[in-house]
């Protein structure tokens, strides 16, 4: 009974190692700000690494295509619900991450019976001052 927290911590550490090893093989996504917005470039020969989420929000994904698509659809649904319930100006990456995506990713990662998302995302937002903001989201819900 006393070793259960240790087992959980060991399982989390193993999951971190597993996901990092899988993501090493992926093709990167790079975001660059410029005067009139931002550019997101994907280096994968496969289509479908860069998406528009909402009017001024874009997503670049690295990882398993099914996980990228599932989280893209989640972000898309959240953004449209937020825009419908409040206003289009209230749809920001900060709100989408803090109240929707990050808690879901964290919960999924910490449930050791489930497979973790194999994903790392770059989100770009052109704010109302026309400057670009970038956020990196990890598989465990951590974002910066």
What role is predicted for each listed range?
Residues 1-144:
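Long, low-complexity N-terminal extensions
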């Amino acid at each position: 009974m006393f070793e259960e927290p240790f087992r959980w911590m060991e399982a989390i550490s193993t999951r971190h190692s597993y996901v990092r090893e899988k993501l090493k093989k992926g093709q990167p996504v790079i975001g660059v700000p410029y005067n009139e917005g931002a550019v997101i470039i994907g280096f994968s020969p496969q289509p479908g690494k860069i998406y528009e989420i909402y009017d001024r929000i874009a997503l670049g994904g690295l990882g398993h295509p099914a996980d990228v698509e599932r989280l893209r659809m989640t972000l898309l649904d959240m953004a449209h619900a937020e825009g419908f319930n409040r206003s289009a100006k209230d749809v920001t990456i900060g709100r989408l991450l803090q109240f929707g995506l990050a808690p879901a990713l964290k919960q999924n990662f910490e449930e050791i019976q489930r497979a973790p998302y194999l994903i790392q995302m770059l989100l770009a937002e052109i704010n109302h001052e026309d400057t670009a903001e970038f956020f990196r989201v990890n598989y465990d819900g951590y974002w910066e």
